[in-house]
């Protein structure tokens, strides 16, 4: 059966936490100060093919909070998933890997970050929702511009 005639299938096989790290290097002294944090969040999405239509996608969230020049905490979560994508052309597959899969994984990563930060003794941290569609569109635009040069 050719790819054009194959029925499209998008399925989640597994969602799991691949890596978790939480550090509060300046505790307990940091807890005695007025908490005026400066938050920096880094987000990264990686994907790779495992075998015939099966892909592994990882959303990595790193949240670093500083007070003045001291790190209050550093939290990193890698939320991963295994997805089946069958019958899609290359553009559709790239879209699913860059938008739909991260949209599926991010709420789990967001919850894990919030839980780790709270368990670390800090006020709850609720990460803002991420517009993976916009990030993907920006990525495509930058790719198109770099090929023109």
Curated annotation (Swiss-Prot):
Keyword terms, alphabetized: Chaperone, Cytoplasm, Protein transport, Translocation, Transport
Compartmental location: Cytoplasm
GO terms (BP aspect): protein folding; protein tetramerization; protein transport
SUPFAM superfamilies: SecB-like (SSF54611)
Gene Ontology CC terms: cytoplasm
Main location (coarse class): cytoplasm
Transport recorded as keyword: yes
One MF annotation (Gene Ontology) recorded for this entry: unfolded protein binding
Highest taxon, organism lineage: Bacteria
HAMAP family reported for this sequence: SecB
Record note on quaternary structure: Homotetramer, a dimer of dimers. One homotetramer interacts with 1 SecA dimer.
NCBIfam families: PRK05751.1-4 (NF004393), secB (TIGR00809)
Family membership: Belongs to the SecB family.
Protein name (record): Protein-export protein SecB
Record organism: Hydrogenovibrio crunogenus (strain DSM 25203 / XCL-2) (Thiomicrospira crunogena)
């Amino acid at each position: 059966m050719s790819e054009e005639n194959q029925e499209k299938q998008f399925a989640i096989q597994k969602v799991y936490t691949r890596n978790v790290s939480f550090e509060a290097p300046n505790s307990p002294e940091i807890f005695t100060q007025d908490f005026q944090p400066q938050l920096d969040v880094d987000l990264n999405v990686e994907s790779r093919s495992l075998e015939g239509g099966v892909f592994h996608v990882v959303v990595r969230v790193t949240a670093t909070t500083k007070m003045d020049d001291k790190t209050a905490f550093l939290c990193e979560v890698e939320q991963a998933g295994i997805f089946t994508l069958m019958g899609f052309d290359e553009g559709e597959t790239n879209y699913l890997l860059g938008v739909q899969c991260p949209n599926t994984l991010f709420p789990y990563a967001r919850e894990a970050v919030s839980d780790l930060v709270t368990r670390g003794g800090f006020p709850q941290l609720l990460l803002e929702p991420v517009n993976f569609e916009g990030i993907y569109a920006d990525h495509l635009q930058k790719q198109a511009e770099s090929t023109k040069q």
